[in-house]
């Protein structure tokens, strides 16, 4: 995690909030509910509830696009050299990072993990 956090700072993101969590299966199912009908849902929620995760709220100009560019393609084998997923991902299922894809998604995801915390 330290190497990813170092890249976060190097790339100009500010960490507005951070939590180390260990999601229950139910937490993972709630967080990834948009994928409930997908064939990978069970494996995804099993994996996400298997070990602790570091959840971050990042801030930067055009943060969503900037973060998604830094993460790289979902499949580490197809991710650009220098991206987090290329460097730290092991497979499409274990790709090291997650990122919101739109402001509405970010609002849900931040609310899911940082309930009651005022974030702009």
Where are these regions (language model features)?
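Non-catalytic terminal and connector segments of soluble metabolic enzymes
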Residues: 1-120
